Curated annotation (Swiss-Prot):
GO terms for biological process: peptide biosynthetic process. It holds the Pfam family EFP_N. InterPro entries: Elong-fact-P_C (IPR015365), NA-bd_OB-fold (IPR012340), Rib_uL2_dom2 (IPR014722), Transl_elong_fac_P/YeiP (IPR020599), Transl_elong_KOW-like (IPR013185), Transl_elong_P/YeiP_cen (IPR001059), Transl_elong_P/YeiP_CS (IPR013852), Transl_elongation_fac_P (IPR011768). Involved in peptide bond synthesis. Stimulates efficient translation and peptide-bond synthesis on native or reconstituted 70S ribosomes in vitro. Probably functions indirectly by altering the affinity of the ribosome for aminoacyl-tRNA, thus increasing their reactivity as acceptors for peptidyl transferase. This is Elongation factor P. Its main location: cytoplasm. Pathway: Protein biosynthesis; polypeptide chain elongation. Keywords: Cytoplasm, Elongation factor, Protein biosynthesis. Belongs to the elongation factor P family. Coiled coil: none annotated.
Length: 185
């Protein structure tokens, strides 16, 4: 059990028969009445985001999520195969389970698979990934107004806004949390 006063971003808790990850929280002390903690939680099974308010000092169960380092091998129909680097055990995850993460996954990429009591919850990506540009319009000389961007399609099918000097074939660093261009690799 953990007090809601000890909430941290990224903490996983078990509340209302669900597994939740704390995305954001705020301690509130109104002029009248008792203090409370307003939180924004993401359901690890469904991916839905919900706002929930707890009384200050309320206790909730901390969920112990195990992260296993795995390598993304390949896609087989709607199943995606991952291999444990230590035991060489392979698991399959459905497309619906990792829909958002698919935009950043390439073969042989190292990821963390989140599990809770043997149940696979999803894939945790690194903060940034390197992806190659497969399609983009050429930059126009003289079009140098500040922060001019253009769309670029990456090798995974993800479309991001990039500066005009980026060309096809270049490798870019992409932030997986926001899905945005960071820099050239």
């Amino acid at each position: 059990m953990i007090s809601v006063n000890d909430f941290r971003t990224g903490l996983t808790i078990a509340v209302d028969n669900g597994l939740w990850q704390v995305l954001d929280f705020q301690h509130v002390k109104p002029g009248k009445g008792a203090a409370f903690v307003r939180s924004k939680l993401r359901n690890l099974r469904t991916g839905s985001v919900q706002e929930k308010t707890f009384r200050a000092g309320e206790k909730v169960e901390k969920a112990h999520i195990e992260n296993r380092r795995m390598q993304y091998l390949y896609a087989s129909g709607e199943a995606h195969v991952f291999m444990d680097n230590g035991t060489y055990e392979q698991i399959e995850l459905g497309e619906k389970q990792i829909e958002r993460e698919l935009k950043f996954l390439k073969e042989n990429m190292e990821v963390s698979i989140m599990t809770y009591q043997g149940e696979v919850l999803g894939v945790e990506l690194p903060n940034t990934v390197e992806l190659q540009v497969t399609e983009t319009e050429p930059g126009i000389k003289g079009d140098t107004a500040s922060n001019v961007t253009k769309p670029a399609t990456l090798e995974t099918g993800l479309v991001v806004q990039v500066p005009i000097f980026i060309n096809e074939g270049e490798t870019l660093i992409i932030n997986t949390g926001e899905g945005k261009y960071v820099s050239r690799a």
